């Protein structure tokens, strides 16, 4: 068998048997992307950024999370892409919309109406030119309590601290430890059950990217690795509960949670952020975190 990127060419039945025996190992492989593939991933991720910017225009009191989902899906399709989340593992919508104590994977609903003082994490993905883009941002709905806004800022800051550690030759645990150390120093807790991930032609590839861990541990960061770093940080306890819908994750103590995510590539000259908050921050202006 010839392994070229993420594609295999099987020549005969004996080779097929050999590959089948290796599948458990292959599924744990970290695929390094070429320069051309990274540029295609950048395009998919930039579209995610533009979609979040479009959604940001409509995050106001009185709007439902289902309305936001429809806006995102229409924008993605109008730009020649496919919503990556829609149908993924049976997920019914194009964005995850997680409000207040919902950590991640909130299912958009006509019954979930945003109100003044809420916060909402919008996680969005696209498939464009055969590659997946994935990014998330936690928005304020109107005026938000100062202590909640502080949580959001700390979570976003921890994302960039993690990205700073995403250097070729370092270890994955350096990223994880930077996020954990900073957030816990601010009095917040790090969710354990949910992690970031590798990304490419599939939304979830190896390696897993925890937001906690030890420096110097984990896979070696190599040129061409593409990963999603996504701190999920709670104001109270780190403990979470999974809702009966099979998707939504909440904080057990019902205190607020925040979630920010960038897709990055490991490069010889340092980490490159493939996704973007620029478009939504242009919409939010002074209200951006």
What are these regions (language model features)?
Residues 12-13, 33:
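Generic extreme N-terminus detector
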Residues 10, 24-25:
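Intrinsically disordered, low-complexity peptide-like regions
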Residues 25-289:
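Active-site neighborhoods and metal-handling regions in enzymes and metal-associated proteins
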Residues 14-17, 27:
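Intrinsically disordered, low-complexity polyampholyte segments enriched for Lys and acidic residues
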Residues 1-12:
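Single conserved hydrophobic/aromatic residue that forms the stacking wall/gate
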Residues 9, 16-17, 136, 232:
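Intrinsically disordered, low-complexity regions of eukaryotic proteins
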């Amino acid at each position: 068998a010839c392994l070229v990127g993420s594609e295999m060419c099987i020549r005969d039945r004996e080779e097929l048997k050999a590959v089948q025996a290796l599948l458990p190992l292959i599924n744990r492989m970290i695929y390094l992307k070429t320069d051309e593939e990274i540029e295609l991933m950048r395009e998919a991720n930039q579209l995610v950024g533009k979609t979040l910017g479009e959604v940001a225009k409509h995050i106001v009191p009185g709007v439902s999370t289902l309305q936001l989902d429809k806006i995102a899906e229409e924008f993605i399709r109008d730009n020649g892409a496919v919503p990556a989340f829609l149908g993924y593992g049976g997920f019914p919508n194009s964005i995850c919309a997680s409000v207040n104590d919902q950590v991640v994977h909130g299912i958009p609903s006509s019954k979930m109406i945003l109100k003044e003082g809420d916060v909402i994490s919008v996680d969005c993905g696209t498939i464009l030119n055969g590659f997946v883009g994935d990014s998330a941002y936690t928005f304020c709905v109107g005026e938000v309590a100062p202590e909640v806004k502080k949580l959001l800022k700390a979570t976003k800051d921890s994302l960039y601290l993690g990205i700073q550690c995403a250097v070729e030759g370092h270890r994955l645990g350096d990223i994880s430890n930077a996020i954990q150390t900073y957030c816990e120093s601010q009095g917040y807790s790090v969710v354990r059950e949910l992690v970031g991930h590798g990304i490419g032609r599939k939304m979830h590839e190896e390696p897993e990217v925890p937001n906690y861990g030890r420096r110097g541990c984990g896979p070696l960061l190599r040129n061409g690795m593409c990963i999603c770093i996504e701190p999920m940080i709670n104001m109270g306890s780190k403990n979470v509960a999974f809702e009966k819908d099979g998707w939504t994750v909440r904080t057990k103590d019902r205190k607020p949670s925040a979630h920010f995510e960038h897709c990055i590539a490991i490069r010889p000259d340092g980490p490159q952020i493939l996704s973007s908050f620029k478009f939504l921050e242009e919409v939010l202006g002074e209200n951006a975190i």
